[in-house]
Structure formats: C-alpha cells, structure tokens
Amino acid sequence: MFLDERLEKILEILKNEKKVKVADLAAKFNVSEVIIRKNLKRLEQEGKLKRTHGGAILLKELAHSSTLEERVINRTKPKEIIARKIIENIQNGETVFFDITSINYIAAEYLANSQKEITLITNMPSITTHFNKNSKIIIIMIGGEYNKEIGGNVGIEAINYIKKYNVDKAFVGSAGIDLEAGKVMNFEANDGNTKKEIMNISKKIFLATEYRKLGILGNYKFSNLSDFDTFICEKDKKDFLESYKKIFDKSEVEIL
C-alpha cells in the first residue's frame, strides 16, 4: 500500500471510530509502530487529527472558502465523475436547475456536448459560455445581485426570480456535510437562502458534492440532509464507510 493510500485509510477509520491506537493501526496495515507514528504526525501537521498518548483523535475539519474560478481551475477527477453522473440523471424534456458549483459548471460543459433537449435554469452566469447557437438546451438565467466570490446571483432578488419557476430536478452543492447532526452547510447566508429556495421549487433534489466533504463543517446550515432525495459523489455506495451508509439510510437519502 502506498503512503497516500494509507493516510487516506487512517482518516477514514478516524471518521468512523473517532479515535485510533498506534498498535491497532500497525497491525491492520502490517507496518511498524514507528511508521504509524510518523503517519499520524504528518496528518496532525496537516490539521486532520490530534495525536494522543498511544494514538490519535479526530479533529472536525472546517471547509475553506474559494472563488468559483479557483474551484473550476481545480478540475479534479472526483468532480469529473460527479459531473458525468449528473448528466446521466437528466432526461429529455425535463426542467433542471444548476446551483452555483464548480461541479455544475463542468456538468454544463458535458450537457452542451450532449444530445439532450431540456430547459436549464441557473443563477451561475459563467456556464452560458458552454452553449452555442446550435445547442438544443433552453437556458433561463436567474437575475439578482452578482456575488463575485461565489460566482453567481444570490440574495433576495435572485430568490424572488427563483420563486416564479417549478423544476423537475435541482442539483445543489455544499461546502460540507455534518453527518452527526445531519446538517448540510455552505459559507454564507445569502447563498444558503438562495439554495433553500432552489430546493423549494424542485420535485427531486440532488446533493452533488465530493465524498471528502462528508464530515467537513461550513459556516451556515442551509438544509438538513434528510431534505434531499439523492446524494451524488464520486464513490459508489459499496465503497462508503458503514457508518456513513447508516446515516444516509436513516435519512432516506439514496446514494448514486
């Protein structure tokens, strides 16, 4: 097993069990306790855990804010996988809402290159650059105050525009998901309240974000996990930690 893979596995165990022991990890990974201590020291330096006598405990990780442009540039494999899953769950004739996320930005690119015929509503102006005059996608742009940090239109004016519509499906992102409390979070109230209204007008609501966001905290709770119908990430349900599966099952949220 490579070092990075072992570090990821250690964090997964920590998220599941909240604490680990050096001896147990050494036995599990068939390496020396010296190596495990070095691994835990590195993870502590990265702010992922706190070392204790003979082991370590989990630190709750806070989400870090960045602009939409920065997130789009950071076009990771998980984002690509999620974007493709989004397109697979859109059918011809539907009206769909894309929330302001880098994943939805990528999904819009795939949508523009597909043969799908839908109506796309969004409050993220930058995605319109993907669609040319030959596109079969009808685009409705939500107006309102443009937030440069978030990369889209949010706040009371945007909310009033959104209230005028009904959609079949909405794809919403988040900065983090507090699984213990069942809270879905972002960074600030205007964006959060806009997301709430997007959810209010949707028949089916998808939470589309990376697996690593599970257990990360944002600044503002905009929804409960149980308010969503489906969770889309880069992993299949069989690859989730058992404790995570139980939380999603209890919340009656499907995992794709």
Predicted segments with their positions:
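HTH-adjacent hinge/linker in prokaryotic transcriptional regulators
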Residues: F2-A23, K28, V34-I100, E109-T119, ...
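Conserved SAM/SAH-binding loop
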Residues: N104
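Conserved phosphate- and dinucleotide-binding cores of soluble alpha/beta proteins
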Residues: F2-E5, E12, K21-L25, P78, ...
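Conserved SAM-binding loop
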Residues: L120-I121, F187
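Active-site catalytic microenvironments in core metabolic enzymes, especially phosphate/sugar-handling
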Residues: P125
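Short secondary-structure boundary/hinge segments and terminal tails
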Residues: E61-L62, A107, E180, I216
